[in-house]
Amino acid sequence: YGEAPYKANSPIPKLPTYKIPNKNESKNTAGVDVDEDGCVVNPNPSGEVTGKNGAPTQTLPPEYIGKLTLPMPDDKNYAGNSYPFGQCTWGAYNRLAQIGMPIEWFSGDSANGGNWGESAKAKGYKVEKGKPHIGWGASFHGGLAGSDPTAGHIAVVEYVNPDGSILVSETNVVKAGSGLRSWRVISKETVAQVNFIQGRK
């Protein structure tokens, strides 16, 4: 990408070489901070630490068989669901309605999965950041855990692990737009940044 395309006959630019620091040096020859093991220390770390999230699966992970307290998700489309078929919002609305903890339909940009936390709070729902509960909605801000940078994502908490990670059910992750529901383990680091929403009985 650059301003001028690379030409085959152009000389390859000389790249800087750096001495690998030993454990007794706090900086390498380029002046980059290193730790006691010689690893580079990022002076401007990201504020978002997501840990390692699991890969989505279309079947319940075997280690959760017999642990879930909620009924398995069904394939019904519940009344009042005006979200586009197959979207994460469509799936979360149906799942929450199925378990008797519905969250109302939100319009416009308020309906984006990543906005559900703020939208629900404005409507008087109980919303807690970083505090998961089984059967609550889980709203991921844009870009978190691989979600769309603009729309974010919404899932439903199915199980809370002792280590602080959670199992969620979600749609529009596997085979986008198909309506297929999948399962995924979300790390405790990611959980800390998620808005959890209690539906209304």
Feature locations, PLM:
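Intrinsically disordered, low-complexity
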Residues: 1-98, 163, 183-201
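Secreted/periplasmic proteins that engage bacterial cell-wall peptidoglycan
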Residues: 43-161, 169-170
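Generic preference for hydrophobic/aromatic residues in regular secondary structure cores
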Residues: 127, 178, 196-199
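A broad, low-specificity signal marking well-ordered, structured residues that form hydrophobic/aromatic
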Residues: 155, 166, 194
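Short solvent-exposed strand/turn elements
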Residues: 165-189
